């Protein structure tokens, strides 16, 4: 695709040429006489937009106020002038007129700073800039759905055990370990994404989007090019991009955030190339902000225009100059994650090989392209930006990206237009898991997880993010713990995010131990992934004064993956001995029962039994012990919830009897 950008300062164009232009930006002086008040944002921001600001400690300020209605009313009185859209962030108005006298009238208004042309009548002759727009190649793929539907375990990459049967696009998710998030249930639910593009042809009937349509998760659409509420009949490019995220055809193609919500905006006119498209983008971003959107995925970019006078030289792609870049950075300032394709000009032999706008923005995540093996795509635009800032930020699969075609079947395409939404969807899933973190905190963790974070370069940026690594890093950030020790009793308290399917393993290492010994197993508490608090008391049955005891807490997130959350060391102050005592852990219990029997004498005929309240024996152990401590673990998976009796005998003499309670899982 062709990527372009335009300076917010367009007054360098010859004043004498203004008559040939059809659209202009009117820069306003202030927002005087505004009917809206910062103190009452409910009149111009949705509840979700206000909540986003509150969660991220973002103040509502004058840039949030709409353009003054009184100024718009005055501009509308000028003959031959139509208002197309406005930007409250930039305090400007986009108008349509070819009348020089009307422009002169507007420029004479006291509240107007300047007017600048941004569009002209399209030149009917062929133009290389337009011809290179949306030049990604699309290649049909064989349909794997019959194979995969017969065998859910047979994935396109040979992988097994995932909750989603991805089909053809598994590899472009697996390169980021994105399936790790999906397997935990994080599929973009409750995250709203806005797509900016040239159109979404046929999305209302495409089978790839059946789920998102039936569940009413396309929240709205708007065409800022034609000022109409439909994007279904325009260019196909946006549909391809959307399919990498929102498709849900198991065995053929499943997107990276198949349960997210979406707004679809047309801001790009594929038939021409003028800076008006950047103003459209700004207006759409502001609409998205007001509507409470969480993320923007934009597969557009600007550096060259039909009229070279609008071009942005490399030093102007500095993150602070282009209209669209300023708007994109402002969107990030309002708490949204802004994702944008880096550009497809990496093979250019001049300065246009560097990232376009708004990918040059300081707070914009510019996404380059690799293949599924992690090799950089030659077409992927280079960094840094014009100010020397690292770009692209990250990379994803943009060469051979699996997409949905017009009938919902899997096809393949090349371009950073596709690498961007592919990873944007995974970032949405990560944010779903950790919504308490700000947009920039999430991006920071994504970048830190990338494979070249410590050695970034101008092709990969920080590299290929790993979402398992990012998840564990955020889990660590959410974790808190404390330890206290009194005599031979150590109390460990902690707070961490979990679900019932997760488990904590507390381990201990005494100086006499060769390795860590499991002390306790605690299951997660809630169905939803949220913060829960735990406490465990460990009573030591051996140990000497000044001996150091190391505790380690692990969280099993899945059956085969765990993370060490906490390690701490305590020092004993007295001799610890069990004596003739019985310690049972845990009680109540959900899984195995672990107990320690202390005895000062040998037990020649040890008998351990577990019975229900009706006296039925459910478990029995017989053996003998030497003086000291005897350890035993009793499996209880087959037991129902209820009360049980643990009895320990020496021959027929009862040494200990303890009531135990099993809780439901």
Predicted regions and their residues:
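C-terminal outer-membrane/trafficking sorting elements
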Residues: 5, 18, 502-533, 541-585, ...
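Hydrolase catalytic cores
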Residues: 263-269, 294, 398-460
